[in-house]
């Protein structure tokens, strides 16, 4: 049925002179789906980075944990956890009709979590020499996520891939900043793991010739 539907749409588009647009749209959908698992895994790793900042609070009783989560480290941990979940959700939405627009919303949401309203603002409140650098790095992650969301809105694999590459680079810079702050160091490794997966997804979308193609099982 799906093949028949594409044939009918192709014939209609050829009649109206829009066959190029149709081919581009179909190709974009397939390309985005190829990067789906990298986004889901990368988002999951970033979510674990947030969990690393919340690990101490999770071992406390309810009242003590509630107070710890309200501290700058806890607020940043919750924000990073929510941002990672939103990035993973963006990858999952590629499966559905209209999924690229929904994925763009999710990526924009992740940018809000990293930006000045939550993560960056909380990091700036930490009383540590490297806290200001970490806050600036979080803002850079938010900016890169915004560019990625724009690429998704435009259904542009190249722009989305470039955006994800920028997100990966800024996540690594954030991890470097976290290494300099003892309170944040526990989250650095997971941020780097997430950056690696997002970079792989960006390479798929950007059409990096060095990116190995995965063989799909043959259907009979």
Give residue ranges: language-model regions.
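N-terminal plastid-targeting presequences
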Residues: 24-220
């Amino acid at each position: 049925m799906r093949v028949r539907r594409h044939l009918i749409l192709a014939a209609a588009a050829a009649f109206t002179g829009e066959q190029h647009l149709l081919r581009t749209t179909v190709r974009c959908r397939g390309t985005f789906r190829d990067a789906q698992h990298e986004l889901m895994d990368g988002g999951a790793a970033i979510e674990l980075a947030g969990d690393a900042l919340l690990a101490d609070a999770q071992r406390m009783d309810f009242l003590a944990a509630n107070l710890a989560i309200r501290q700058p480290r806890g607020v940043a941990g919750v924000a990073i956890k929510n941002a990672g979940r939103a990035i993973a959700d963006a990858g999952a939405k590629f499966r559905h009709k209209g999924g690229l627009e929904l994925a763009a919303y999710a990526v924009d949401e992740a940018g809000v979590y990293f930006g000045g309203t939550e993560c960056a603002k909380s990091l700036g409140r930490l009383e540590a020499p490297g806290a200001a650098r970490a806050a600036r790095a979080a803002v850079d992650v938010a900016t890169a996520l915004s560019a990625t969301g724009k690429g998704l809105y435009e259904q542009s694999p190249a722009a989305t891939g470039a955006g994800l590459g920028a997100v990966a680079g800024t996540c690594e810079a954030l991890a470097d900043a976290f290494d300099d702050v003892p309170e944040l160091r526990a989250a650095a490794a997971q941020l780097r793991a997430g950056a690696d997966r997002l970079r792989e997804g960006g390479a798929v979308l950007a059409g990096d010739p060095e990116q190995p193609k995965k063989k799909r099982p043959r259907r009979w």
